[in-house]
């Protein structure tokens, strides 16, 4: 007898999660965006949704939901994607998805400690993505003024961190409360 390798491909569940996740992300980003007063910068509830999807399905689904959802929003809203921010949202989903194994939401438990640590991670991820990746992308790709894009990045970092801390945390807690806790007992 030989050992069979577990299929490491993209599962049907992941494909469906990506499609539904990106569609909901697009709708939230398009229709529930609150202006901040800084041009092209909004309080975005879609980032809280991305936290749930990435926490449930991992980094690849998080990456794709961020990329696809943001691309759709920009294409519909502005006529073309703003690639530096599309890429940044994808990277944000990827980074959030790295928390999947740690959060272990499928086991129906989410401690306060895990939730606090997740929020520290999402805050660090927000800083990396919106203070570094997005502004540098704007400068390199679009030749935007540094002062403008770093202001946009700083504001986005703050509002997205708050959005994920509130909306993302509430979604994670609600999901876990809706799941039965898995015990360590196994039926034979």
From Swiss-Prot:
Its main location: membrane. It is found in: Cell membrane. Gene3D superfamilies: 1.10.1760.20. Keywords: Cell membrane, Membrane, Transmembrane, Transmembrane helix. It is a multi-pass membrane protein. The chain crosses the membrane at residues 15-35, 48-68, 79-99, 121-141, 154-174. Disulfide bonds: none annotated. GO terms for cellular component: plasma membrane. It comes from the Bacteria. InterPro entries: ECF_substrate-spec-like, UPF0397. Belongs to the UPF0397 family. This is UPF0397 protein LCK_00164. It comes from Leuconostoc citreum (strain KM20).
